[in-house]
Amino acid sequence: MKGAIMGKFVVKEVNSGFKFDLKATNGQVIASSEVYSAKPSCLKGIESVKKNAPIANLENQLVEGYEVMKNPKFEVYADKSGEFRFRLKAKNGEIIATSEGYKAVDSCMNGVESVRKNSENAVIE
């Protein structure tokens, strides 16, 4: 697709298995996975992000009395240190990607949109 925004999934071997990072076109890591025990499981996690991120609902847990959305969904929340984060849950409720901490809510929301845009057509390295 000409003109499509394309990020990339980078698979890394770590001490206890494999994980992936989703990087935006500028090379910045915008979401990361848990550690999977085997590479095929990690690749399945990537496929799940590619399938779920573009259609996921947005559940803003920062709003008092927020509406609980159906999976798949992005959950935006504040962590214990007061930073804003998001996690992407698959249809089965499993967390398949998480963000770094952001100082501003707007930056966190931009991160969600970046995952939506960059994941669907992303290449895997």
Feature names for model-found ranges:
Residues 39-66, 107-125:
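A low-complexity, Ser/Thr/Gly/Pro-enriched, surface-exposed linker/loop concept
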Residues 2-15, 51-80, 122-124:
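Intrinsic disorder/low-complexity detector
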Residues 8-14, 19-36, 45-49, 73-103, ...:
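A structural feature that tracks compact, well-ordered secondary-structure segments
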